[in-house]
């Protein structure tokens, strides 16, 4: 009997070790890799692999839990436990699943705190401290090898009807995370970050007009350099559009709500069709990256300049309605493409999945309790 007990104890200990540690190493050891490593050698044109791409890790929708998440009393034990387990999961995922890939860039696509727009300054700063700890921002800021870029989401500044009336929320966000509309270059690829929450707002508001002025200024210097459009809210698609094989939940159709008095946006899950068409025509991206939906989705838009792929990256949190949290690895070319190559050859992506925390609890921790 004691042999069976010892055997079961060893099996349980190994299962616990796998669920709490080794499972988070699987993406870097086995299931995921930088997409440029699989590109045809003919594209390399004699350039060394190690220096010919900028490596970008894309993360979205951590939505750190707070008093707005589960309607639990602030500082209650239940809320503290929920925060602890979600924070621990994301920190393990970041340190053990994402950082081992040694990315040059960390790109966040928005929604950092669940109740970001309505938290008090004290609560917001507390969430900011947790965010910095989870994603080890102090270490990243001290490293000369990793740069971090941020995109704002609706859980950061609210939708247009909110942030146009609460400019202090936007200022608070910008103080720590930086500008909402900006551009940057990685290798030979331009990235255009747009504040999607303001795109469909009242055109008379300063915050919406500022976003569109930025987009139009960007459109004035379009050249042959490939562009990636970054938008927290996904672009428009017709209802029931397939999201591809990585989707784990039903597709959500277009939903939009406007204020009666000024038609400002109260809620939306996609950018409107009009704004989508204008963005694609003015910016002319070869790729769009988005978040917001919490689940994975890949679709193709047809613009007047050709087909454009959009990847909606799933949430990195296990508590945001997606059993299969994910992140994305993106390789941006850092050399001149051979003649005859398309702009799409400059960018490649690979979706990577994180451990299913619920399965770990069921298979490892529940037997422990028994």
Residue ranges of model-derived segments:
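N-terminal active-site segment of His-dependent metallophosphoesterases
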Residues: 1-125, 130, 136
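Short active-site segment of divalent metal-dependent hydrolases/proteases
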Residues: 64, 113-114, 156, 235, ...
């Amino acid at each position: 009997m004691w042999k069976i007990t010892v055997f079961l104890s060893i099996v349980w200990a190994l299962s616990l070790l796998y669920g709490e540690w080794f499972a988070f190493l699987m993406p870097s050891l086995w299931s995921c890799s930088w997409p440029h490593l699989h590109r045809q050698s003919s594209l390399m044109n004699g350039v060394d692999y190690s220096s010919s791409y900028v490596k970008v890790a894309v993360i979205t929708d951590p939505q750190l839990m707070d008093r707005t998440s589960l309607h639990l009393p602030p500082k209650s034990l239940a809320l503290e436990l929920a925060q602890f387990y979600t924070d621990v999961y994301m920190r393990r995922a970041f340190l053990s699943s994402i950082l081992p890939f040694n990315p040059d860039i960390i790109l966040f696509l928005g929604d950092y705190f669940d109740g970001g727009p309505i938290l008090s300054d004290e609560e917001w700063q507390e969430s900011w401290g947790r965010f910095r700890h989870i994603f080890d921002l102090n270490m990243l800021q001290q490293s000369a090898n990793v740069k971090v870029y941020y995109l704002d989401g609706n859980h950061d500044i609210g939708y247009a009807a909110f942030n146009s009336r609460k400019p202090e929320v936007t200022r608070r966000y910008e103080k720590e995370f930086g500008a909402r509309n900006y551009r940057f270059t990685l290798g030979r690829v331009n990235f255009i970050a747009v504040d999607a929450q303001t795109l469909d707002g009242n055109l008379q508001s300063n915050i919406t007009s500022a976003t569109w002025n930025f987009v139009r200024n960007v459109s004035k210097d379009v050249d042959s350099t490939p562009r990636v459009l970054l938008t927290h809210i996904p672009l428009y698609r017709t209802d029931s559009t397939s999201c591809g094989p990585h989707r784990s939940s039903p597709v959500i159709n277009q939903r939009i709500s406007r204020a009666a008095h000024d038609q400002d946006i109260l809620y939306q899950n996609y950018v409107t069709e009009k704004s989508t068409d204008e963005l694609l025509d003015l910016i002319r991206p070869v790729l769009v990256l988005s978040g917001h939906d919490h689940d994975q989705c890949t679709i193709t838009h047809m613009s007047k300049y050709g087909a454009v792929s959009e990847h909606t990256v799933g949430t990195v949190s296990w508590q945001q309605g997606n059993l299969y949290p994910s992140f994305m690895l993106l390789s941006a070319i850092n050399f001149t493409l051979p003649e005859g190559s398309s702009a799409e050859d400059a960018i490649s992506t690979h979706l990577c999945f994180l451990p299913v925390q619920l399965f770990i609890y069921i298979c490892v921790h529940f037997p422990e309790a028994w």
